[in-house]
């Protein structure tokens, strides 16, 4: 079907989901769903990430905003493609960008959706300094998936001298016991050690 559209209707989106299902790989579905225990296997269609990226990029050549108005969270793949389109959206203001970001992080329910969204959110570079306090707020949430989103966004975009001290402070304060928060904290510190060694070593010594 044609994915570069000026306008998306519910019927268009339903047709898109049918096309998405045509890319399903049952063996991959079984394997991938086993890596994401937070969702039932039935939540997965079994579409590989390169295919989803290609579809998301094609949709983004048209009216991505109209597509987002029709999207549902009925499958891992639909949710992931929503995140890809948001990441590719050329927003007109920081307010619009943060609205889409906030909306999506509320929908995160697995490490895969979280990390894929964060990695694809290239538009955040356009609003880097404005977005940083917002990312810090994510790490203060009661929702472990929003905390993880904040930590992974810091890992992806803010491991620089200008931000590293605040990043490490946020990491230290994000003490939610959820497994995937703990893993994100460890991942963040390990990556920070490679990129900002001096500051991160001070942080590690102060917490030893």
Features from the language model and the residues they span:
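Alpha-helical scaffold domains
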Residues: 1-208
């Amino acid at each position: 079907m044609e994915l570069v559209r000026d306008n998306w209707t519910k019927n268009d989106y339903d047709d898109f989901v049918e096309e998405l299902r045509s890319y399903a790989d049952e063996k991959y579905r079984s394997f991938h769903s086993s890596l994401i225990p937070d969702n039932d296997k039935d939540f997965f269609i079994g579409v590989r990430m390169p295919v989803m990226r290609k579809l998301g990029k094609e949709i983004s050549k048209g009216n991505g905003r109209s597509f987002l108005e029709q999207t549902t969270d009925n499958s891992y793949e639909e949710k992931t493609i929503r995140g890809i389109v948001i990441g590719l959206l050329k927003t007109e203001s920081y307010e619009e960008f943060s609205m889409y970001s906030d909306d999506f992080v509320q929908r995160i329910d697995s490490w895969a959706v979280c990390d894929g969204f964060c990695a694809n959110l290239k538009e955040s570079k356009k609003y880097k300094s404005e977005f940083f306090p917002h990312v810090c707020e994510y790490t203060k949430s009661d929702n472990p998936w929003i905390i993880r989103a904040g930590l992974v966004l810091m890992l992806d975009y803010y491991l620089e001298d200008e931000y590293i001290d605040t990043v490490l402070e946020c990491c230290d304060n994000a003490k939610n016991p959820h497994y995937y928060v703990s893993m994100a904290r460890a991942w963040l510190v390990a990556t920070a050690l490679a990129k900002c060694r001096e500051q991160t070593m001070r942080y590690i010594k102060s917490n030893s």
